[in-house]
Amino acid sequence: MKEEVLGLPIEKIQEKIKEYDFSPRISNIGYVKSVGDGVAQVSLLNAAFVGEIVIFESGIQGMVLSLKEDSVGVILFGRDEYVKEGEVVYSTGKILQVPTGSGFLGRVIDPLGNPIDGGGLIFPEAYVPVDNEAPSIFDREPVKEPLYTGIRAIDALIPIGHGQRELILGDRQTGKTTIAIDTIISQRNYGTICIYVAIAQKRTNIARIVQTLREYGALSNTIVIATFPDDPPALRYIAPMAGCAMGEYFMRQGERVLIVYDDLTKHANTYREVALLLRRVPGREAYPGDIFYLHSHLLERAAKLSRKLGGGALTALPIAETLAGEISTYIPTNLISITDGQIYLDTALFNAGVRPAINVGLSVSRVGGSAQPKGMRQVAGRLRLDLAQYREYAMFLEFGTELDMATKKKIERGRRIEELLKQGAHEVQSVEEQIITFYLANGGFLDNYPVEKVKDVVIKYIAYLKLKYSSVLTLLREQLELSDQIIYQIHNIFQEFEREVYANPSNPQA
């Protein structure tokens, strides 16, 4: 039996020695001047550049984030208690790269790609730079392909398209994350790859979100990138960029990708913390001067690529938190100006029991109807008009004004539409079911039913269609248009449905 050293035969070791290059190497090294709060000041790293990865003698990695005449500021990807003053720091000349690939789907990882769900090792398909240039104008296509959230109020009134950036903002505990999670759940039927980036979120919240995605069958096409409040600032800082880099990998393979940043307010606070520790000059609200660039550079990477580049798309849903409903503060206004629209969640509506608590008046999608199928455009235009008229006329009711029959009818129609826009958490609805729902509302089919019963009527009618006339739903799903044939069938089937389910349509309470 041949003698072995370090698990290798002697012959193999001798071959390795012959292959080894013993010529001198020039390496740039420095020494730790000070360390604390996840940041180290390193001297003598004269050739360092911003974004460069350095390795400490203790094995901790860091990234250069500021340059001074006599030192460089490094943020640490590990605990700073393992780094000591005077410790040697080695320059690598490389930028940060993260692993990515289909093996990460269904897993919970940290921003560096390390699994934190106890599920074993992940074998990456590639390593991609965290910081990439956004696709140029010539590499993009207009946003036209709809991304269905499964939420009626959004798909009808604030449509989102693949490649768009739509901000979700509102006060704490108003349902921002719920909208994002429902959108991810809705993508399980459309083959969209989803990435959920949790920035400084509680472990209990992450566990609940992962469990929800698993229960609704959406975890298998989702990567969860999680950072916690007690993580080093460096991990919280790079989390959205790492998630974006992973999403870009799939986008360039022609895939449709949805990424959620939850939330960029916490990310801005992390960057402010890091910048102050690095002694950068503070600006408005003590944020560093390049905070706008940081977020715009991140969100500009979302795109719908041209066909010559594979036609993939990366859609971004950044989340921002407001304070006392004030959307004119620094970070929210920055993000509103960067994105292609916003969904504003109103605390007053939330407290009144409206779910989702979307303030339609302050919400907008700058892509608009171009990201809606024809069938949805057919019903959404009338829907907006009826809803706007209802809110205008409803003001007169507060003063006890007597109204004519036509106005009263519009108010009653508006009440039913408003009721149909309410939707519970995780109750996502397919686009064909939404089109039928709003067609019934616009067409007056629900006018004879009490407001509190209209949702129940629609649910029963769609169940009736699935049971007896599934071909109508299939045809609408394929055409995504309310053709004369489909409209004729909807009318006839609804009359039949009323006869069978409600013996006396004129007295539906019976």
UniProtKB/Swiss-Prot annotation:
Cell location: Cell inner membrane
Entry keyword annotation includes Cell inner membrane: yes
Reaction catalyzed: ATP + H2O + 4 H(+)(in) = ADP + phosphate + 5 H(+)(out)
Name of the encoding gene: atpA
Family: Belongs to the ATPase alpha/beta chains family.
Quaternary organization: F-type ATPases have 2 components, CF(1) - the catalytic core - and CF(0) - the membrane proton channel. CF(1) has five subunits: alpha(3), beta(3), gamma(1), delta(1), epsilon(1). CF(0) has three main subunits: a(1), b(2) and c(9-12). The alpha and beta chains form an alternating ring which encloses part of the gamma chain. CF(1) is attached to CF(0) by a central stalk formed by the gamma and epsilon chains, while a peripheral stalk is formed by the delta and b chains.
Binding-site list for ATP: G170, D171, R172, Q173, T174, G175, K176, T177
Descriptive protein name: ATP synthase subunit alpha
Membrane topology note: Peripheral membrane protein
Pfam families: ATP-synt_ab, ATP-synt_ab_C, ATP-synt_ab_N
UniProt organism field: Dictyoglomus thermophilum (strain ATCC 35947 / DSM 3960 / H-6-12)
Alphabetically ordered keywords of this record: ATP synthesis, ATP-binding, Cell inner membrane, Cell membrane, CF(1), Hydrogen ion transport, Ion transport, Membrane, Nucleotide-binding, Translocase, Transport
Gene3D superfamilies: 2.40.30.20, ATP synthase alpha/beta chain, C-terminal domain, P-loop containing nucleotide triphosphate hydrolases
UniProt EC number: 7.1.2.2
Domain of life of the source: Bacteria
